[in-house]
Amino acid sequence: MQWETDLIKDIRTHSAYDDKDTSGDSGIRHPNEHLWPWDEVTDANRNAIKERFLKVRDNCKAILEIGVCRNEKDSITHIFLDNKLPDTVYIGIDIDDKSFLNDPEKNIYTIQGDSSSITEAVEIFKDLGVTEFGFIFIDGWHSINQVLIDWEYTSMLSPTGIVGLHDVSSHPGPHYFINNINEEKWNVEKNVCPFDHGVGFAWRK
């Protein structure tokens, strides 16, 4: 699997812990938990994601978002939809129906299903003419096992593409993944928003 070449070690515990999603299950103490509560998606998150996306926008042929539009108008999804070029294809994968976002004339598509179904998703990508992504954002189920699976999509990351992970502060999957990426192969920003749920980024060297 892709993570086996991109991580410095296996982050799995080979226990039920590997399927835990929430920060409360993780045992990771958020360094700023005394500031709780904060919004699920903060202005700092949105600004950081927009800033990184704009760096690659002009060469970004397609965007993949795992976990779609769960915060209505404040959702990260709208950063991509509002700022992508007209010819850039947006594909969002979510376990729930997000088809209200679909707009083929604007190259906006969603897939209802489990992001673990990679083979099926890739076939849909091919049908849409997508062979690589200039930006991949992972914000689905936050367990260790699921993030390892979702990382498989980075095999389709363009040479100049960026991967973003939300909830890296204390959710187990994103937290342990971003902190164990092989920095000989990847440039890594482990957490640019440490005062909330956090967001991290990686791009190939």
Annotate the PLM regions.
Residues M1-F137, W141-K205:
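A short alpha-helical cap/connector motif
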